[in-house]
Amino acid sequence: DKYDICLCASHGLVTEETFKKLKDSGVSMYHENIETSRRNFPNVCTTHTFDDKINGIKTAHKVGLTVCSGGIIGMGETFEDRIDMALTLAELDVESIPLNSLIPIKGTCYEDLPTLTEEEILRTVAMFRFINPTAYIRLAAGRTLMSNSGEKAFTSGANATITGDMLTTSGNNIDEDKAMLTDMGFSI
């Protein structure tokens, strides 16, 4: 009770019993990205189904956890797929939506995809905000594709971020992020 910290777990697809154990141990949020739209999902994942993701999110809510779920843009999907992903997250009443922008990495199946433009990322952020007006729209991987660490994205609709390095790419400097967000009038 000394610190006001929300514990968020990210353990993949789990059972209702596991969700209950996580909640009982102090976890208040569960992270389960849907990755993309239902239509595009088979193109990016073959180990489980889109419905597996949806059922996990519904079960997390059922046991009283809030949910963090978003996806990755720039994996060959259409803008319509992005709209469908945003609508699905709104339908599921997801409280926190991380938006990752793909940075094509040599040696991966996505290495030859075009890099997203800043304008494309900003339009996507604005659309997610419009469809999910009360959710945290959380900038995640790919902020380095935008000028000024993605500052414009915070005026386009993002109101949260993940800072520091990501799984496969370098991220933004924490101190620089804090200074930028404070200068923009956000509380940290």
How would you label these PLM feature ranges?
Residues 1, 23, 57-62, 125-130, ...:
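Surface-exposed amphipathic alpha-helices with a cationic face
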Residues 14-24, 75-90, 144-156:
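Catalytic cores of alpha/beta
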Residues 19, 54-57, 86, 121-125, ...:
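Generic structural signal for well-ordered alpha-helices
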Residues 45-52, 77-84, 112-120:
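Alpha-helix N-cap and loop-to-helix initiation/capping positions
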